[in-house]
Amino acid sequence: MTSAVYLQAGRDKSLKRKHPWLFSKAIKKIKGKPGLGDTVTIHDSEGKFLATAAYSPHSQIRARVWSFDEKEVIDQHFFERRLRRALEARSQVIEEGGLTGFRLCAAESDFLPGVTIDKFDNVLVCQLLSAGAERHKGEIVGALMAIFPGMSIYERSDVEVRTKEGLEPIKGALWGNEPTAPVLIAENGFKIEVDIIDGHKTGFYLDQRDSRAALERFSKDKTVLNCFSYTGTFSLYALRGGCKHVTNVDVSQPALDTAKRNVEHNNLDLDKVDFVKQDVFKLLRQYREDGVLFDTIVMDPPKFADNKAQLTGACRGYKDINMIAMQILKPGGTLLTFSCSGLMEQNLFQKVVADAALDAGKDLLIMERLNQAADHPIAGSYPEGFYLKGLICKVY
């Protein structure tokens, strides 16, 4: 028998607005003994049905909603319906970009909490971060096999956040053969190498596709500095845009080696590219000391804040790194700067960048705002799905 969760009076407002999370403090009582990932029904204080959800006894988010339809059964057909809808929603962007790599499912933003799925050519990569996603792993794999017959399915749930759900980090093949070599995907006319097994996250940052395309417009006859370059895909767009030279900077030699191969995959001019293994903060200060200047700088750092306690320090980090970047830009140069920290709201990020300009002694013009690509949608009921913020700035 399905366990039932009953809420405190007045704690049902977010669920009535179809937000997918239920926090432990909102719960009054539980009928039954639900285990890790078990399906439960959620009811208001008067017993009225609100949602069907996955129970997570170890997390502050005690339940994540699967459905607000009382009649909907959480089985393989449920996951197949949700995933087919997610694929259909992305059909236009996939066709327009000639994409063989894209995010198929963006977890809560596609109404499947904890379920992230990326498609890289003929391999589907799953990251299952919630107790419910783990519990229904078999049904999720079955749904993917029905939609994408013949494709391999690989799991990259090797992240510490799973421990908050009482789950162990894990990775490995779920169906088909484990990839023995990097996969090549197509993006806006480029061939891009993706390391599914050992790359960051699921292997590649698909969410920055539109931002990479934006760089192409600010590259003609420019010297470009690509900070935190990872596998160098921003530099591909800079090269196609006609840059004089682009410098990729990252602390990972394997990532830089992949960046070099990406230039070769696309028959671009290696003589116009440098690959620098260095800490970005240290190198920027060295450039400032040596008087090295660039026309265009891409500043795409990793997440600086995983929780609210880290937000103040993250603001300092973003301000410091953007300040130095502005100091090594030529007058009228272009800065493309980003934050992937969901806790860093758009207005706060803009203020941090503006403060960096003041500290740098520069005048700042914000020309455009950027965010995550269209295969990373934001559900109207889940504003937390908006996490990637970008600004294109002119600096004088």
From Swiss-Prot:
Residue stretches making up the PUA domain: 2-79
A Pfam short name: PUA_3
Domain of life: Bacteria
Subcellular location: Cytoplasm
HAMAP family recorded: 23SrRNA_methyltr_I
Homology family: Belongs to the methyltransferase superfamily. RlmI family.
Function: Specifically methylates the cytosine at position 1962 (m5C1962) of 23S rRNA.
Full protein name: Ribosomal RNA large subunit methyltransferase I
